[in-house]
């Protein structure tokens, strides 16, 4: 399975705190520095992440998928499932709130395309992120998908076009 092979995702069985979730390691330079989990079903808390005492690096100070960026272009998404849909070159910021450290990391790439979910709040925050990043050298764009509410639900042909144009 590509998600397991490329992104290192694993399943969690019946543990007390993280029952029936996908375990998503977050790596920087090949080292897992923190993690998050995603509920398998649609009930319960969608994402649960490492507590501060369980992580080497705070989750909001890094970008998900940064080790898989092949060049100087990134597509910025909210979270891991969107990154999986887009593939290597996509990075995630773990939600709609983007830290100054994440802004600087995004700005270190010459070409940044921000692609958040199609909700009104998400689109507003994508525009705000673009404003923050665009003061840094390079090209910054915001794109809104036409075929789905987010990359994980979008038409694979549209995702292929996104990759072709932006990565």
Q: Model features per residue range: what roles?
A:
Residues 1-12, 25, 29-32, 74-76, ...:
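Replication-associated primase and helicase/ATPase modules
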Residues 2-111, 125-126:
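Phosphate-handling DNA/RNA-contact segment within nucleic-acid enzymes
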